[in-house]
Amino acid sequence: MRAKPATVASMLDYDTSAIYTFLRMRIPGLLSTEGAVGIGWKRGGVMVAGAVFEQHNGRTVWAHVAIDAPLSRRFLRAFLDYPFAVCAVDALRGYVLASNTRLRALARRLGAVEEAVLAGAARDGGDVVVCTLWRGNLKHDTLAQH
């Protein structure tokens, strides 16, 4: 009988430094912020999604997000639980390139609104959208218990 090959499971990763490295490869110019908290998702030992939360002020926390592969429910739950259950903020905010239609669509599916457009603010001269997910607008069922 042949043994099954070993597989590396998908898993959450909380190494903020490694998550910043993943994000910087996708968000040129991203700077580290002291006290930031990272949540990543590895598949087969490779980071495929990551978020870093920073500038928590009691009401809002900002996130930098990059996603290379379809999201797992477990990563999404951790991503949403951190700001709303752990930090207990009213709003999660992030800057999204206007050209990143995939991330903007995901934000809208979760209940986020596009609060502002920063014309010409992107490195390439494109626009940047400020997306805000208010606790009361959250459409994802993973926080039903909160």
Each predicted region: which residue ranges?
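Conserved beta-hairpin
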Residues: 32-49
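Conserved acetyl-CoA binding element of GNAT-fold acetyltransferases
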Residues: 56-69, 95
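Conserved GNAT acetyl-CoA-binding A-motif
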Residues: 85-96
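Short amphipathic alpha-helix that is part of the acyltransferase structural core
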Residues: 1-29
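Conserved catalytic-core motifs of GNAT/GCN5-like acyltransferases
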Residues: 95, 113-128
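Conserved active-site alpha-helix within GNAT-family acetyltransferase domains
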Residues: 99-116
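C-terminal "cap" of GNAT-fold acetyltransferases
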Residues: 121-146
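Glycine-centered recognition micro-motifs in short, flexible terminal segments and loops
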Residues: 67-78
